[in-house]
Amino acid sequence: MKTVLITGFEPFGGEQINPSWEVVSQLDNAILGGCRVVARQLPCVFGESLAVLNSAIDALSPSVVLAVGQAGGRTDITVERVAINVDDARIPDNRGNQPVDVPVIPNGPAAWFSTLPIKAMVSAIREAGIPASVSQTAGTFVCNHVMYGLLHKLSSMADVKGGFIHIPYLPQQAAAHPGAPSMAADTVRRALETAIITALYVDADIIVAGGATH
């Protein structure tokens, strides 16, 4: 049976929970599309997050790796297109590290593109009645760090797809951030299940507009 590795993060930035792990942990040992899903939590720490991720990939030999992170303020499920080779932290990570303009991988490419069928995933999530879009930036904090490091590792591995999805706050978090959008955990879970199945069985992405003007 094929394996899908899905990851979420521990809380950071003063939050008591991280919606990515709250939802991703529910998928551990699930069977989706005939494949076993394994969930792992990543520390919100530069360097350490990639060490944990790389160890999980080496141990599990997954067919798909989907990293998930919190994007407070976003209104929908956002499937990331690209990760860039820079750490530029506006706030410290959970170990107090705050790199500024430091490469994720020294001498690595300027960017890596997701190898997931991102537009097909967005389309399938929308068809499930859940708001979703392609995102053009994963930021420059630990989420981008993980996405870049993941894709850099997978570039030397045959037949393994990988990428990143950002999700909004959960309602209980938004209650502490008046005006902030949120999405229920059950809805996020359905979106991630849909994304996983699409990633498993769509090899060539669909050609539809998913860009941004700014």
Curated annotation (Swiss-Prot):
EC number(s) recorded for this UniProt protein: 3.4.19.3
The protein, known as: Pyrrolidone-carboxylate peptidase
The entry's keywords: Cytoplasm, Hydrolase, Protease, Thiol protease
Gene source species: Escherichia fergusonii (strain ATCC 35469 / DSM 13698 / CCUG 18766 / IAM 14443 / JCM 21226 / LMG 7866 / NBRC 102419 / NCTC 12128 / CDC 0568-73)
Catalytic residues of the enzyme: 80, 143, 166
Assembly and binders: Homotetramer.
Family: Belongs to the peptidase C15 family.
GO biological process, one term: proteolysis
Protein encoded by which gene: pcp
Domain of life: Bacteria
